[in-house]
From Swiss-Prot:
SUPFAM superfamilies: NAD(P)-binding Rossmann-fold domains. The gene is SOU2. Belongs to the short-chain dehydrogenases/reductases (SDR) family. The lineage of its organism: Eukaryota, Fungi, Dikarya, Ascomycota, Saccharomycotina. GO terms for molecular function: oxidoreductase activity, acting on NAD(P)H, oxygen as acceptor; oxidoreductase activity, acting on the CH-OH group of donors, NAD or NADP as acceptor. It comes from the Eukaryota. Pfam families: adh_short_C2. Its EC number is 1.1.-.-. CDD domains: MDH-like_SDR_c. NADP(+) binds at I47, K74, N119, Y188, K192, I220, T222. The keyword NADP applies. This is Sorbose reductase homolog SOU2. The active site is at S173 (proton donor), Y188 (proton acceptor), K192 (lowers pka of active site tyr). Unknown. The enzyme has no activity toward sorbose. Keywords: NADP, Oxidoreductase.
């Protein structure tokens, strides 16, 4: 009598194998987010706002998260322009209880969450970590860039498991895979490496009920890169095969793919959108 074997180490979290998605005959329809609810942290500007607007254009209702820059006007813009439901929520993502409260409020206001993008982040601008006194600067970067995205996943995961499906997308960074020069940013690199591997780890844990992926942007023209002087940016561009920074909207395609049914068999992936930086 042969012994029954299985490759599933996480079957206790839900039934496996998962049910295949029904993909529309027209592949363009697979990229539609109509009827879905998307929640995007750090979406009052930069990459987060570009993603939030892209999701609204694709038909999703969108919950916008902000902290220091109110975004009620942007939620109103999405509703008026694209005919979707949108609302802005203030949240300190480094406070687990605040994250928990906001997620519960979004679930109450929208009825559910289908797509969650953990995008909030800050840059390291202090230079060599060995010259920085104390650990406060380190803790700030790790709290925002790593701990906060775990808080979001920890609260949203049960919603996905209850639904039996969902898409969770982390904003990692090419810095998760390489060491940037000429700027020195050990804290940021380490935090983003943690995000990338957290994404891969949860893709296994959540396989019975959700897909989990990450996007790793390269140099993007947002406020996070404003700390760099022209000489530093010149070096960046010399090391980037496409020779320029990206506009935030150039990342939206990656986030839309991962959120949509077009990516129904994509989990545990990290999509580098870096102008070719990490291949040289």
């Amino acid at each position: 009598m042969s012994k029954e074997t299985t490759s599933y180490t996480n079957a206790k979290l839900g039934p496996l194998p998962t049910k295949a998605a029904t993909i529309p005959d027209n592949i363009l329809d697979a990229f539609s987010l109509k009827g879905k609810v998307a929640s995007v942290t750090g979406s009052s500007g930069g990459i987060g706002w570009a993603v939030a607007e892209g999701y609204a254009q694709a038909g999703a209702d969108v919950a916008i998260w902000y902290n220091s820059h109110p975004a009620d006007d942007k939620a109103e813009y999405l509703t008026k322009t694209y005919g979707v439901k949108s609302k802005a929520y203030k949240c300190n993502v480094t406070d687990f209880q605040d994250v928990e409260k906001v997620v519960k409020q979004i679930e109450s206001d929208f009825g559910t969450i289908d797509i969650f993008v953990a995008n909030a982040g800050v840059a390291w601008t202090e230079g060599p970590e060995i010259d920085v006194k104390g650990v406060d600067k380190w803790n700030k970067v790790v709290d925002v860039d790593l701990n906060s995205v775990y808080y979001c996943a920890h609260v949203v995961g049960p919603i996905f498991r209850k639904k039996g499906k969902g898409s969770f997308i982390f904003t990692a960074s090419m810095s998760a895979s390489i060491v940037n020069v000429p700027q020195l940013q050990a804290a940021y690199n380490a935090a983003k490496a943690g995000v990338k591997h957290l994404s891969k780890s949860l893709s296994v844990e959540w396989a019975p009920f959700a897909r989990v992926n990450s996007v790793s942007p390269g140099y993007i023209a947002t406020h996070l890169s404003e700390f760099a002087d022209p000489d530093v940016k010149s070096k960046w561009l010399q090391l980037t095969p496409l020779g320029r920074e990206a506009k935030p909207r150039e990342l939206v395609g990656a986030y839309l793919y991962l959120a949509s049914d077009a990516a129904s068999y994509t989990t545990g992936a990290d999509l580098a959108v870096d102008g070719g930086y990490t291949v040289i």
